[in-house]
Design a protein with these regions (language model features):
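Short alpha-helical segments and helix-capping/turn motifs at coil-helix boundaries
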Residues: 13, 30, 80-82, 137-140, ...
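In a subset of proteins, long, contiguous C-terminal domains/tails are tracked
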Residues: 761-810
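Long, low-complexity, charged/polar intrinsically disordered accessory regions
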Residues: 302-312, 328-338
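Hydrophobic, small-residue-rich alpha-helical packing segments that form membrane-like cores
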Residues: 21, 26-34, 39-80, 84-91, ...
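Non-catalytic, conformational "gating/processing" segments within enzyme and secreted inhibitor domains
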Residues: 26-27, 41, 78-113, 547-583, ...
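Glycine-centered hinge/linker elements that transmit conformational signals in sensory
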Residues: 108-124, 579-594
Length: 810
């Protein structure tokens, strides 16, 4: 930690602003701008900036490119940077959080001796008194054009800053009701009528002087065509909250859940914790820094009403984002060239035109039945690893009692491995649509469980479908039972089928507009993994499947199964066995056992294969994947260690020195224990041939670097890999996920990371050099996937790879 703090503090105390490095970073900023220019999130954000108050700082461009960061003899950039640093970087305006294992006194000394050098220039905090949105423009609707098939409706209401109300959180109280997804909620009514896929509510922005409360709705195609009906419905629901939603009981429920969540808050990644704390120090007093996000100290009805008084039809900016919205003579945002237009709204119409049948269905949530009551720890010691309790009618039952974090939580994983899910691209699509139906049917009922600290996910995978339920163990069984009933007899409706199928088609079509390196990497995964299919194959299947076919598939999915159950955490063995009986009775009663083997990775041909993809993006994408010979721990350890040693020099050479792009990295590219290295570059300027030439020149030079690695350096790099592998678990979920991965790969000893760490420790420099020479220099078993230029087509390459045997398992 100390050497890192030495370097970190000097960046702020005495930055050099070396002219050459300033220009390099200028190019890096431009590369990032270019790489993300086609992303709808950034493009839509630029529309929000363009339609905000020109007098507010938010209106300004906040990314940077070669034009805005001009660096010429007449207008050099370095003096402006130095002036900016002197004006803005003053100790009295800065906050710092250091997170480490050392005692507090030691950490304090580390900080004072290093960060004390940052000058206190007694600068005043900059304020932005202008409103975020111009009052005389409201109410208005902004329509913007999306590149991808995305449809959203957002309402943004100017409200006073809420930073001083962090102890009472009136916006959290109101947003909890507006964003609720339970029966009768705004979202539930919209979803049941096929108009929306998701809804969220909360603070959009808070500058300290003013803020916005935002309601964001992801629309279905039907919702897009009827968005003018949705707006009055939103205001009708706000009226219901205003009339009926303010109550002591609701506050006490929210307060109780916040207290429980704070009491049993799980530790996050150290870097994320430090970032969160340093940021919150800008908003909260130091004494409250740990508890501030969870504080709800008192019932504050006047504050709730004050917020609600701003949520009116005459005080709203509505944003509609859609592909090809039919704009006439649109404006274009300055840097992202996003088409948009603005038009006034009729506030009176928004208040009076709510569709009658939909408005009558709206109601506020009932008391939450999932609020945990029993928060005690189960008796017994934490088990070292899961134990196999037996096989119940073909279902493997794994159990591990674990109370090491003193939190009354548990995680349950239940995998329905089934041959039906992996037959074809069509069965893959049907599995996804079936999972969507199950999730859709559960959402309204289970939303209260999410609010009460219970979480669940139901997701398709290579061998079938997995149900994961986790959180406070007290009422976990209630949620699990309802989920099992839906899995056993899912309700599939025509409306939901049509929406889910269209969402899947949109998602698959949008992949053609992903970043180039996302497309190159995805090609590698779908071409090499058994039981996966190309986007084109899945898209064709999605367009053809029918509702009748899905209903038949729902029955076929459970006809043959290879089920696995794991129960882990603050829970008893008796519960695990009882749950297994429940699963058997509800889900597996008519199922036959059929083993479903794990998928494998296909072996690449001996010589490098070059594949060229056609993408809808101006940047060049490049991914070089070099595959190991076997899945042995020894081979995996060599690739892990090689990635550790090569990643920083590769980044330094390709991104920093050669300035080829913003997205540059070398990384382990392991799939299903098959080791590999990945070299990834996305460039706004270089061709795929130029990128490959640069990569070859780098790897040629790196051979000497690797040959000169000292024994001391090698041991240091090994320790870095081992430390990453053996990093201490911070919360129950991390352990559950690791156990579940071990069960999936059949590693009943639950010691894969220990074996891999041992193998890393044993790697010799000669072994490392041989692996580098064969895999990186000679490119044995290499797959280079690029955008543009020469190469095999995706279909031709996939056909060749499909003929290959799997990588040797050891």
């Amino acid at each position: 930690l100390e050497p890192a703090l030495d370097r970190f503090a000097q960046q702020f105390a005495a930055p050099l602003f070396t002219a050459e490095l300033v220009d390099r970073e200028r190019n890096a900023v431009h590369s990032e701008f270019s790489a993300k220019k086609m992303e709808d999130g950034r493009r839509f954000y630029s529309v929000k900036k363009a339609t905000s108050n020109p007098e507010h700082a938010f209106h300004q461009f906040a990314v940077g490119n070669l034009t805005t960061l001009e660096n010429t003899d007449d207008n050099p950039l370095r003096p402006d940077l130095i002036e900016f640093w002197k004006a803005r970087y003053s100790a009295n305006l800065m906050t710092l959080a250091v997170y480490g294992p050392q005692p507090l006194d030691t950490l304090e000394t580390m900080v004072q001796t290093r960060f004390g050098a940052i000058e206190n220039r007694n600068r005043q905090q900059r304020t932005h008194s202008a409103s975020l949105l111009e009052a005389d423009v409201l109410p208005a609707k902004v329509t913007a054009e999306a590149i991808k098939d995305v449809r959203s409706l957002s309402l943004s209401f100017p409200i006073p800053s809420q930073r001083e109300n962090y102890r009472t959180k009136p916006t959290s109280y109101i947003a909890n009701l507006l964003g609720h997804e339970g029966p009768g909620s705004l979202f539930d009514v919209l979803k049941k009528n096929g108009l929306a896929d998701s809804l969220s509510a909360g603070i959009g922005m808070d500058t300290g002087e003013n803020a916005t409360l935002d309601i964001s709705i992801a629309l279905t195609p039907e919702g897009l065509s009827r968005h003018d009906e949705i707006l009055p419905l939103v205001f009708r629901y706000i009226d219901i909250v205003r009339e009926q939603g303010i109550s002591q009981q609701r506050f006490e429920e929210m307060q109780r859940l916040a207290q429980i969540d704070f009491r049993f808050r799980e530790q996050g990644e150290p870097v994320q914790e430090a970032m969160r704390l340093s940021s919150q120090l800008q908003d909260y007093p130091a004494d409250d820094i740990l508890s501030a996000p969870w504080l709800m100290e008192r019932y504050a009805p006047d504050q709730y009403r004050n917020i609600l008084s701003r949520l009116t039809p005459d005080n709203v900016m509505v944003y509609l984002l859609a592909p090809q919205p039919g704009l006439k003579n649109p404006n274009l945002t300055q840097w992202y060239e996003t088409p948009w237009q603005i038009e006034p709204l009729n506030a009176e119409a928004l208040q009076t035109k709510a569709p009658g049948a939909l408005a009558k269905a709206l109601e506020l949530p009932l008391p939450n039945p999932f609020v945990p009551e029993n928060l005690a720890m189960v008796p017994g010691k934490t088990m070292d690893k899961p134990e196999l309790l037996g096989n119940h009618e073909g279902m493997a039952i794994w159990f591990a009692r674990d109370t090491r974090f003193n939190t009354p939580k548990a995680n349950v994983f239940f995998s329905l491995r089934t041959p039906a899910a992996r037959i074809s691209a069509r069965s893959h699509v049907l599995t996804r649509l079936l999972v969507d139906s199950i999730n859709n049917n559960l959402n309204a009922w289970a939303y209260s469980a999410r609010l009460a600290g219970l979480d669940y996910s139901i997701y398709p995978h290579l061998r079938g479908v997995t149900v994961r339920v986790g959180g406070y163990s007290d009422k976990l069984h209630t949620l699990m039972n309802r989920i099992l009933m839906q899995v056993a007899t899912p309700e599939v409706t025509r409306q939901r089928f049509d929406i889910a199928r269209q969402n899947l088609i949109d998602s698959l079509q949008n992949k053609a507009k992903d970043r180039p390196v996302e497309q190159t990497s995805e090609f590698i995964q779908t071409a090499l993994l058994e039981d996966t299919w190309s986007t084109e194959e899945k898209l064709l299947a999605a367009r053809e499947v029918t509702l009748d076919e899905l209903m038949s598939f729902a029955e076929a999915l459970l006809s043959e199964v290879d089920p696995v159950l794991m129960v882990h955490g603050n829970i008893t063995e008796a519960y695990a066995l009882n749950l297994a009986q429940q699963i058997d009775a509800i889900v597996l009663g008519k199922s036959d056992f059929a083993p479903v083997e794990r998928s494998r990775v296909r072996k690449l041909p001996a010589e490098e294969m070059l594949v060229s993809l056609s993408v809808e993006h101006p940047d060049t994408g490049y991914t070089l994947y070099t595959q190991g010979k076997t899945t042995s721990f020894e081979e995996r350890s060599r690739f892990r260690l090689l990635a550790q040693i090569i990643s920083s020099p590769f980044y330094e050479e390709i991104r920093t020195t050669r300035q080829l792009g913003y997205i540059v990295y070398a990384t382990p590219f392991e799939m299903l224990e098959t080791p590999a290295l990945g070299f990834v570059v996305q460039s706004p300027t270089a061709s795929q041939e130029a990128i490959d030439q640069a990569v070859r020149e780098f790897t040629d030079g790196f051979e000497n670097t690797l040959g000169n690695v000292s024994e001391e350096r090698l041991e240091r790099e090994k320790q870095a890999v081992i430390s990453g592998l053996m990093e201490r678990d911070r919360h129950l979920g991390e352990i559950s996920e690791r156990y579940w991965r071990e069960i999936d790969r059949g590693a009943d000893g639950f010691d894969s990371r220990e074996k891999l760490a041992k193998a890393v420790k044993a790697v010799s420099l000669e072994e490392l050099k041989t692996t580098f020479r064969n895999s990186v220099l000679n490119r044995d078993r290499a797959l280079r996937v690029v955008t543009g230029g020469e190469g095999l087509s995706a279909n031709k390459a996939r056909d060749l790879i499909l003929q290959q045997p799997p990588v040797t398992a050891k």
